[in-house]
Amino acid sequence: MLDERMIRIVVAFIVSLLTVLIITPIVKRIAIKIGAVDQPSNRKVHDKIMPRMGGLAIFIGVVAGVLASGIYTETRMTAITVGAFIIIVLGILDDKYQLSAKVKFLIQLGVAIMIVSTGLKMDFFSVPFLTERFELGWMAYPLTVLWIVGITNAINLIDGLDGLAAGLSVIGLSTIAVMALSGGKVLILSLSLVVIASTLGFLFYNFHPAKIFMGDTGSLFLGYSISILSLLGLYKSVTLFSIVIPIIILGVPIFDTTFAIIRRILNKQPISAPDKSHIHHRLMAFGLSHRMSVLVIYLIGFIFSISAIVLKSATIWLSLFIIFILIIFMQIIAEVTGLVNEKFKPFTKFYKRLVKRN
């Protein structure tokens, strides 16, 4: 007979999925009515006005799933829920009024500080091959705040093609769910699955050709959710490789952001300057269709996620080897697609010199 908790989780998953499937068309009409729409531009791939704010449907689905699962009684859920509500309101206002980056950052900072004030933080750091552990002390507070704010924005940075951010979030959250299941962490498993179900329900309307965009309402909420779930998994103890796992789960947006910064520095552009050279843009410029570009990035995200799962139980040397291979893998993709520019190919140049010597 199935455990009662597992039955609740399955019911919560179904409730979240059905809620979003039903509510998304309503959210779409509301977005159009209030003018929360995305205008076409030369930096964007869509050529018509699109309703934003789809993240509101995801949020409503998550709330429905949480209520169905009964996990709202958990002690840490109050602060997490308040933070999620603030992030959703922030996203809705941004989708409608295009808030400044400074305003968004300050509000996210406030949410992160509120979460940390409840005691949910990383208290010490340990390295597997050293016996001594390093107490973070007062540094636990800024590091945890940085973690929450950084990951909250990570999904927003990759939200450039139909279904891309939603699909990558599902892949990342599924990885967290698998790890939570293997570790017997019911709260993380339950939250992960209701967010997955809600995002899948939204993806039905968001995959190419999209009928609605998630907007900052969705990307910020999904980023916030992943930051909290990964933090719950790291709670108190942070090891060298445990902190790498959520970074690998978010490998695609982190990789894309890192190379965007390198690109803008080398091209002498402001770091915050928008451009059309993100990985999804480069894949399309490479000749891939909109849908195929998304699927290729899904595959990359899947590779990262499988690597994260293997890392969880790998030896130190295998962990280092996997991380090294992932770095080389992403560097090759960056050079092949011209992610920085056509001249930035250090690995290719090194390989050619090596071949000539032999």
Swiss-Prot record:
It is an enzyme of class 2 (transferase). GO terms for biological process: cell wall macromolecule biosynthetic process; cell wall organization; lipopolysaccharide biosynthetic process; teichoic acid biosynthetic process. Its EC number is 2.7.8.33. One of its GO terms (molecular function) is manganese ion binding. It holds the Pfam family Glycos_transf_4. This is Probable undecaprenyl-phosphate N-acetylglucosaminyl 1-phosphate transferase. PANTHER family: PHOSPHO-N-ACETYLMURAMOYL-PENTAPEPTIDE-TRANSFERASE (PTHR22926), UNDECAPRENYL-PHOSPHATE ALPHA-N-ACETYLGLUCOSAMINYL 1-PHOSPHATE TRANSFERASE (PTHR22926:SF3). The record marks D94, D95 as: Important in orienting the substrate. The lineage of its organism: Bacteria, Bacillati, Bacillota, Bacilli, Bacillales. It is found in: Cell membrane. Pathway: Cell wall biogenesis; poly(glucopyranosyl N-acetylgalactosamine 1-phosphate) teichoic acid biosynthesis; Cell wall biogenesis; poly(glycerol phosphate) teichoic acid biosynthesis. Belongs to the glycosyltransferase 4 family. GO terms for cellular component: plasma membrane. It is a multi-pass membrane protein. The keyword Cell cycle does not apply. Catalyzes the formation of undecaprenyl-PP-N-acetylglucosamine. Involved in the synthesis of anionic cell-wall polymers as it mediates the initiation of the linkage unit formation that appears to be common to the two types of teichoic acids attached to the peptidoglycan of B.subtilis; may also be involved in teichuronic acid biosynthesis. The chain crosses the membrane at residues 10-32, 53-72, 76-93, 105-127, 137-157, 164-181, 186-205, 218-235, 240-262, 292-311, 316-338. Its main location: membrane. InterPro entries: Glycosyl_transferase_4, PNAcMuramoyl-5peptid_Trfase_CS. It catalyses: di-trans,octa-cis-undecaprenyl phosphate + UDP-N-acetyl-alpha-D-glucosamine = N-acetyl-alpha-D-glucosaminyl-di-trans,octa-cis-undecaprenyl diphosphate + UMP. Keywords: Cell membrane, Cell wall biogenesis/degradation, Glycosyltransferase, Magnesium, Manganese, Membrane, Teichoic acid biosynthesis, Transferase, Transmembrane, Transmembrane helix.
